[in-house]
Every structure is written in C-alpha cells, then in structure tokens.
Amino acid sequence: MATPYVPVPMPIGNSASSFTTNRNQRSSSFGSVSTSSNSSKGQLEDSNMGNFKQTSVPDQMDNTSSVCSSPLIRTKFTGTASSIEYSTRPRDTEEQNPETVNWEDRPSTPTILGYEVMEERAKFTVYKILVKKTPEESWVVFRRYTDFSRLNDKLKEMFPGFRLALPPKRWFKDNYNADFLEDRQLGLQAFLQNLVAHKDIANCLAVREFLCLDDPPGPFDSLEESRAFCETLEETNYRLQKELLEKQKEMESLKKLLSEKQLHIDTLENRIRTLSLEPEESLDVSETEGEQILKVESSALEVDQDVLDEESRADNKPCLSFSEPENAVSEIEVAEVAYDAEED
C-alpha cells in the first residue's frame, strides 16, 4: 500500500535568505558572549536561560529597515545620586568605532556588585557588574561565568602575549556554595581589573561588547535590566532614607547640645550679673564703715585731747604750789646768812 504524499511548505525567495541570515545580536543582560559561540555547551546553556528577553540590532545587510523612534532610557549615576536620561536619537548614531576610541576614553574598572542564582528552568549563577564609562554615566550588565571564560579564550587568541588570571572551573563540588561564589566573585573582579589595566585589551571589540560600551543597555531592554533598574532605585531610596534618618538624629543631638550650651550661657550671665552687683554693696558698706571709723577716731582724738588737757592742768598746779616754798627757803637761807654775818 503506497503512502500518500504530503507536501511540506518550504520558504522560498527572500524569506529563505533572511531566515538563514546571521544576525549580530547586541549584548543584552547576560549571555551575549555566549550567543556568539557555536559550541554545543553554549547552545545548551543558552537554551536553558528561560524566557529572558534578548535584544538585537539590525544587521549591516538590512539597511532599509526602519529605525525605531522610541526614546532610549538610560540610568545615570551622578556622584551619590541617580537620574534617568531620555534620548530620542537612534542607537545607531550613538555607536562609536572602537578604533577611534582614545586611551583616555576607556571606562573605569567595572565593579561586580554581587551574584544571583537563577532557577527559571536550569539553575545557574549570574554576576551583576556595574560599568562606569564616565563619572556621570554608568549602567549594569549581567554575565555568567561562561561569558567570562569565552571572553578569556577570545583574548588569548587576540593577545597571545597576555595571560589573564581567570578563576578555574569547579567540576565535582557544589558550584552554588556561598563561600565558593564569593571567592569566584573576587577572582572575576581581579580579572576585570586586569582587562582595564591594558590599553589594547580595554579597547578591543570583545571587551567593548562584553561591557556594552558602545551600546549601553537600557532599563527596559530585558527583564533583568528592568529588575536591575528597579533594584538600583530601591537601593538609592534606601540609602537616601538612611542618610535622612542619620541627619535627623544628628540634628536632634545638635539641638540638645545647643540647649545645654544655652543653659550654660544663661548660668554664666547670671553669675556675671551677680558679681557686678557685689562691688556696689561692698562700696556702700566700706563707706559706712569708714564714716564710723572716722567718728570713732575723732571721738578718740577728742578724748585724748581732754586727757592731755587734764594732765597739763594737773602738771601746772604742783609747780605753782612748790614755787612758794622754794622762795621761802631762799629767804630763810638769806636771812640766816645775814644773821650769821651780824653775829660775826
């Protein structure tokens, strides 16, 4: 019995060619480097990433495609504050040629903020990396250890003379142990520092794609970027509330200190006022005492004068009484002398 022939529709014409076109995908929240690899392991990992949104840019062959006019929203960190920038320019106009980038335009050392174990379909760990292109502009990207490993392989091919230290893989033990993940995070941070320390490596295309330097991700490019944007806002809000609480406590302590100082000032003013009144009272007392002393002294002088007068009077009376007997004695003596002379 013959099997009936069932025609199978096949794409023809331009649709077939567009179906097989290799589209260059932009680095999204994570797995951007993984998507450029054709290894079976990379395909298996990328297939297990769940329903994470992947964004792409138009390829160079499709020049007639319309440019999306939706605004580009970027998260910016200015010092300790954050802001959102809305730009209506197409992203193609913002892309820069890596060959024309100067050494001074290289970004600062990316900082790994932490890691997260994802359990959508397959369990894996992603690392949250903060990239600062300029002090005013920064963004967050998510990368897996596989992305770091493939970037390291590319850099070995491009720069054979450089050997970048990448934390080794772990085959037999638990890859989700907290201590192990923290040690790996430190190793990946050292790997990123070595990337930025070399001029040629920091400006190569592989590193720029890895860090999304030419096309920074927006907060709504994927679910992970949106969540990272919300987490950034939450962290900023928490930090500002904490600073506000600390400032309020500091203000309360300063108010208390001010009241204590004011009380101390009032006490000192009262003491000064009291001390300023005491000399007047002492002067009054001294004046009265002086008058009394003068009166006493004057009375004492009067008494002394009276005593002296009495003494002088007493001295004068004996002198007068004794003067008469002296005259009498002299008269007697003269008389006696005269009498004796007559007898002779």
Swiss-Prot record:
Lipid bilayer topology: Peripheral membrane protein
Keyword Disulfide bond: no
Compositionally biased tracts (Polar residues): 14-26, 41-66
Record-listed Phosphoserine modification sites: S222
Domain PX: 105-218
Binding, a 1,2-diacyl-sn-glycero-3-phospho-(1D-myo-inositol-3-phosphate): R144, T146, R184
Region (Disordered) location: 1-66, 81-107
Compartments, as annotated in UniProt: Early endosome membrane; Late endosome membrane; Cytoplasm; Lysosome
Function per UniProt: May be involved in several stages of intracellular trafficking. Plays a role in protein transport from early to late endosomes. Plays a role in protein transport to the lysosome. Promotes degradation of EGFR after EGF signaling. Plays a role in intracellular transport of vesicular stomatitis virus nucleocapsids from the endosome to the cytoplasm.
Assembly behavior: Homooligomer. Interacts with EGFR.
PANTHER family named among the record's database cross-references: PX SERINE/THREONINE KINASE PXK (PTHR22999), SORTING NEXIN-16 (PTHR22999:SF23)
Annotated domain remarks: The PX domain mediates interaction with membranes enriched in phosphatidylinositol 3-phosphate.
Name of the protein this chain belongs to: Sorting nexin-16
Organism of derivation: Homo sapiens
Organism classification: Eukaryota, Metazoa, Chordata, Craniata, Vertebrata
